[in-house]
């Protein structure tokens, strides 16, 4: 194609991860011609370097731990995990880093794909530099959606290039188990990768500036995870950070690390799990009056607030509302509906919980941390409520007292907490920590998003004996607290 030709579509989507795919799916289903631009693999970070490969590494580790602890089974669990088999399983779950199936889906959905690096080139215009060195010019009649996600944010360590650190990408795609792995960070990536690689046989040291892990979840849940990591043999250095780190080079190529508290460590690999940065540095933001490299602020319809005309949307991690794949897909469904409605000249339903408002970003964001034990949370934490000045009733229960939990593991360790708005008598936050609690989470999300009254929840009968009976115990505890 000539550089001077312009392909015109109703919608142009930059970024073909799960978020971009869902925006494109919604707009194409609404009858709008849609093109999606991708510089790497269709399917994005989640499919190849985050959600899918990380959970493929974690599931065998968590299953092994549960089996080893269970009466009558533990004796049959001998020897270490077969790391080679686990890594092959990870490869299969990541489609061997081949996006053929995802491209086939785009074709079946009649969504056009342009491979290359897409940059805004003024209002409603995108220029794509293709891998072959060509240029494709695109124009949108109605909207451009930026769905470029995030990349690893690295700390300013001296000699970073020579250090050759792991980011989350290397941690989920490594071809062999390192003998010694050091991890800098206290968040989800840090604790999940500590769990996975320790289970696969690495000696793991986790270093965190914070005084505790997982600062955004309830403290009781983070403490349970920290205890299990220590029991598994992970060394935790909390309340400190890396002063210097150097890769020695030579035959061993080890990383020599000095901590701020004076501790010295040696590792074969260093994972820097220190947060995320928006992938907006080189997407042409300056051509529409925005600053490259910044997060893109949006309203509840995901239109970028700093750009007039309601034609530019930022969906998923890039808007910083909730850095989670499933929440980005939720945003994509809303944004796609908004774009389609505006293209047809329809009035938007932007009220709270309306069809064109991302209310869940503010009130009901679910997240699972796949550690031992699992953490599943949605809505407010007690710290969130305190910061917002909201009065809530806090209800706690030890999950290990539930019959279903004892059936799951006679030594079950876990805890549940719900936060209740005493005036409205609805749940506004829930956190569960324990084996198998991820599957409790959607019931909590429904209770919060549906604003189900506490009195109605008594009619939602949990099956016996299941871990979900903790819901009944929480209601009983709340009843007794109010007497």
Range-by-range predicted roles:
Residues 92-99, 172-173, 178-182, 188-249, ...:
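Rossmann-like dinucleotide-binding cores of NAD(P)H-dependent redox enzymes
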Residues 14-40, 52, 56, 60, ...:
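Flexible, glycine-rich terminal cap/loop adjacent to redox cofactors
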Residues 161-178, 265, 269-354:
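FAD-site-proximal beta/loop scaffold in flavoenzymes
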Residues 12-14, 118, 138-149, 183-184, ...:
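Short hydrophobic core segments
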Residues 4-17, 177-187:
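Beta1/beta-strand and adjacent pyrophosphate-binding region of the FAD-binding site
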Residues 76-77, 112-115, 119-132, 200-300, ...:
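A Rossmann-like FAD-binding core segment of flavoenzymes
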Residues 2-9, 26, 46-137, 217-243, ...:
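N-terminal Rossmann-like dinucleotide/flavin-binding domain of flavoprotein oxidoreductases
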Residues 15-18, 39-40, 184-187, 217, ...:
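Glycine-rich Rossmann-fold phosphate-binding loop(s) that bind the pyrophosphate
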């Amino acid at each position: 194609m000539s550089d001077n030709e312009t392909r015109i579509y109703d919608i142009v989507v930059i970024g073909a991860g799960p978020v971009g795919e869902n925006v494109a799916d919604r707009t194409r289903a609404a009858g709008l011609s849609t093109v999606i631009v991708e510089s790497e693999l269709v399917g994005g970070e989640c499919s190849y370097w985050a959600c899918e490969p990380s959970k493929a590494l974690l599931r065998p580790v968590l299953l092994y731990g549960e089996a080893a602890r269970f009466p009558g089974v533990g004796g049959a669990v001998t020897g270490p995990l077969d790391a080679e088999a686990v890594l092959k399983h990870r490869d299969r779950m990541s489609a061997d880093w081949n996006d053929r199936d995802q491209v086939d889906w785009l074709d079946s959905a009649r969504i056009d794909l342009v491979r290359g690096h897409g940059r805004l080139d003024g209002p409603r215009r995108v220029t794509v530099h293709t891998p072959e060195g060509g240029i494709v010019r695109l124009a949108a009649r109605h909207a451009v959606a930026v769905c470029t996600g995030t990349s690893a944010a690295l700390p300013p360590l001296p000699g970073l290039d020579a250090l050759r650190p792991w980011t989350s990408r290397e941690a989920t795609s490594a071809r062999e188990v390192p003998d010694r792995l050091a991890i800098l960070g206290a968040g989800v990536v840090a604790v999940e990768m500590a769990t996975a690689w320790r289970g696969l046989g690495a000696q793991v040291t986790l270093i965190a500036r914070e005084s505790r892990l997982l600062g955004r979840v309830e403290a009781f849940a983070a403490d349970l995870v920290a205890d299990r990591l220590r029991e598994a043999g992970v060394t935790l250095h909390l309340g400190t950070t890396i002063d210097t780190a150097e890769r020695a080079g030579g035959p061993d190529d080890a990383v020599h690390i000095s901590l701020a508290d004076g501790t010295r460590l040696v590792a074969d690999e260093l994972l820097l799990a220190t947060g995320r940065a928006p992938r907006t540095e080189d997407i042409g933001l300056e051509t529409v009056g925005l600053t490259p490299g910044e997060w893109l602020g949006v309203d509840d319809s995901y239109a970028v607030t700093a750009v007039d005309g309601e034609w530019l949307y930022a969906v998923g991690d890039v808007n910083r509302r909730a850095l989670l794949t499933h929440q980005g897909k939720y945003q994509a469904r809303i944004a796609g509906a908004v774009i389609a409605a505006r293209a047809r000249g329809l009035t938007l339903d932007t009220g709270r919980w309306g069809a064109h408002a991302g209310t869940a970003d503010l009130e009901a964001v679910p997240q699972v941390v796949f550690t031992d034990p699992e953490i599943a949370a949605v809505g407010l934490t007690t710290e969130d409520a305190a910061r917002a000045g909201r009065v809530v009733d806090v209800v706690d229960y030890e999950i290990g007292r539930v019959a279903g939990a004892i059936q799951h593991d006679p030594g079950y360790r876990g805890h549940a907490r719900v936060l209740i708005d005493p005036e409205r008598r609805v749940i506004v936050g829930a956190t569960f920590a324990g084996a198998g609690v991820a599957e409790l989470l959607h019931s909590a999300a429904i209770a919060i998003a549906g604003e189900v009254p506490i009195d109605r929840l008594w009619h939602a009968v949990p099956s016996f004996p299941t871990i979900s009976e903790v819901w009944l115990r929480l209601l009983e505890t709340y009843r007794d607290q109010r007497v």
